Design a protein with these regions (language model features):
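Conserved strand-to-helix beginnings and helix N-cap segments that scaffold or border functional pockets
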Residues: 53, 83, 113-116, 196-200, ...
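C-terminal accessory "lid"/substrate-recognition subdomains
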Residues: 2-3, 48, 147, 156-337, ...
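Nucleotide-state-sensitive switch-loop elements of NTP-binding domains
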Residues: 2-174
Length: 413
């Protein structure tokens, strides 16, 4: 069935996914089966020689000069250094009025949220991309064979030579979770490389990480065009509420998938954490296997001795980050609100362990706090450091053995 153009503004689909997941293969498939659509394409690759663009040109989807236009963006990733270029290219393509849809294939190391934010970015004249183009669908392509092993690892992008800027301290697991949690559609690709039970378990994991996303099965990037174009699924407010940890905190519990052992638990308390005991839990116990395999945990926490600040807790795979989030509201009912998602979780043990990390009646804050000081930038309303600097603080690597507090690999800005 031909795709009807229902928008006055140019609808945009953004393809995200880690390197090798199959974004370009999916892009080739869409272009080869576009059913008469006039499609403009923006591709972005990290290398000086744009490999992804070369694959699109040389693949089975021949680009017609009269129907498609390919725009290459090199020397950076969409989410950071090339945002101005992205603004200009999307604006130009939209104003030409010659295309039914725009596909943006982001770099394998790009997070989708900043790409979406680009559409609301106001220029000097007050105009935004949203005036001429409309985000239609955020698509994340997942490699069925490698997603869980990569999520469990603690590799930094820099260790693989993938960091787009010098002080980028993001990890592969950070990126994978960000890409999944902000998706409207998750294309589960390369299913021919895993058995049916592994595929079902991965689906359950993805559904737990992002309960609102559509999960589309694919082999060699082959999907129905209508699954990724013209879905009208993207909504910023909905996207911000899509991650499983947010829905759990809001009371929208995702049904347990006991068959695959995927579950979650929510920890809440009005008491602050004892910094030393929490540090021990995070660096020595959380990834030790006694609680099951914790794939993702996130939420808000408070430390004794700095109770005026609410911290943001974010863990993906074997890496955890702790950073200031906001000045704590003294009227807030809870000091701790954490969600832990994983495989074969022992919820009772987790609850007991975290309870043991809380301050006890009559206990005073310790003189030694192993968490580095938080710089609140002198503001009563501040963002997490990654929002201000473009990258997150150095993580706690849960796979490393913490020998002393001084040499622990953590930095909270």
């Amino acid at each position: 069935m031909p795709y009807d153009k229902p928008h006055a503004r140019l609808p945009v689909t953004v393809l995200s996914g880690f390197l090798g997941a199959g974004k370009t293969t999916l892009l080739n498939h869409v272009l080869a089966n576009r059913e008469g659509l006039r499609v403009a394409v923006i591709v972005n690759d990290m290398s000086e020689v744009n490999i992804d663009a070369a694959l699109v040109r040389g693949g089975e989807a021949a680009l017609s000069r009269t129907e498609e236009r390919l725009v290459e963006m090199t020397n950076g990733c969409i989410c950071c250094t090339l945002r101005d270029d992205l603004l200009e290219e999307v604006d130009r393509l939209a104003r030409e009025g010659r295309f039914d849809h725009l596909l943006i294939e982001s770099s394998g190391i790009s997070e989708p949220m900043p790409v979406a934010a680009t559409f609301a970015f106001a220029r000097d004249d007050g105009a935004t991309l949203g005036d001429v183009a409309e985000l239609d669908t955020m698509v994340t392509v997942v490699d069925a064979a490698n997603f869980l092993p990569e999520l469990a690892g603690g590799d930094e992008l820099a260790e693989r030579g993938l960091a787009p800027y010098e002080d980028d301290e993001r990890t592969v697991s950070d990126l994978l979770v960000d890409q999944v949690e902000f998706a409207d559609v998750i294309v589960l690709n390369k299913l021919d490389l895993v058995d049916s039970r592994a595929a079902d378990g991965l689906r359950a994991t993805l559904a737990r990480l992002n309960p609102l996303a559509r999960i589309v099965a694919a082999t060699h990037g082959r999907v129905d065009l209508r699954q990724v174009l013209g879905t009208r699924l993207f909504d910023l407010e909905r996207a911000q509420q899509a991650p499983g940890w947010v829905r759990e905190l809001n009371g929208d519990h995702v049904p347990e998938t006991e068959e695959y052992g995927i579950s979650s638990t929510v920890f809440r308390s009005e008491l602050p954490f004892h910094p030393g005991r929490l540090w021990t839990f995070v660096t020595e116990e959380l990834d030790g296997g006694a609680f099951g395999r914790v794939l993702r945990s996130k939420g808000f926490f408070t430390l004794a001795g700095r109770s005026q600040v609410t911290g943001l807790w974010s863990q993906a795979g074997s890496v955890a980050r702790f950073e200031p989030s906001a000045v704590r509201d003294p009227e807030a009912p809870f000091a701790q609100e954490l969600v832990l998602i994983g495989v074969q979780l022992n919820a009772d043990r987790i609850q007991t362990a975290l309870t043991n990390c809380l301050m006890r009646p009559g206990e005073r804050p310790p003189d030694v706090d192993p968490f580095p000081a938080w710089d609140t930038y002198g503001s009563d309303d501040f963002c997490a450091p990654e929002q201000q600097t473009g990258h997150a603080p150095t993580p706690v690597d849960l796979l490393d053995t913490v020998r002393t507090r001084e040499d622990a690999q953590v930095q909270a800005v």
